Amino acid sequence: FGANDNMTRAQVCQMFYNLLLDKDVAITVNFADVSDGAWYAKAVNTLASLGIVKGIGDGMFAPDRAISRAEFAAIASRFAKASNVGSVSFADVFADDWFYDPVLTAVSYGWISGYEDGTFKPNANITRAEVTSITNRMLARAADTNFLAGNVAALKQFSDVPVTHWAYGVVMEAVNGHDHSKTDGVESWNGLTR
């Protein structure tokens, strides 16, 4: 799965593109470093045309560059069309930072949190496991731990995400298609769909 690998800008675009309900979007933005044949081209250009992602300047996107926690918070907030609903204080996030509002938005919605030392680490790269965890929270998805425990052999597994990994349930939720029902916001899996 690459749980501890840094998430790239292209990967984030593809993930959010896959979540779009309406993919029929007029492409109004293209980047010089995103070739038409690239696996992520449609995702990048669509999300850029919707104003969800932005380039790095000079008509470039830097698709292979690792994405920071601040960048991801900004993209997630724009994707969800969410705005800041609270106030949170971090030692390294200031009102004049470009990412101030998106970080506070993501935190106020409970999608992402800071660290015990009172920092957010906005410029730190974000991992695939962290992105999966945040995205599941955005979508109000959570794995049914009882189902997971009773069906380990049937689940799509990854050697770098053992049952003891902090993101095991998060990853299982994201990669294993399943039928489910919800009661009081708690997801109960009824079976795998593959």
What are these regions (language model features)?
Residues F1-C13, Y17-K42, S49-A70, R78-P102, ...:
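Feature responds to low-complexity, polar/acidic, surface-exposed segments characteristic
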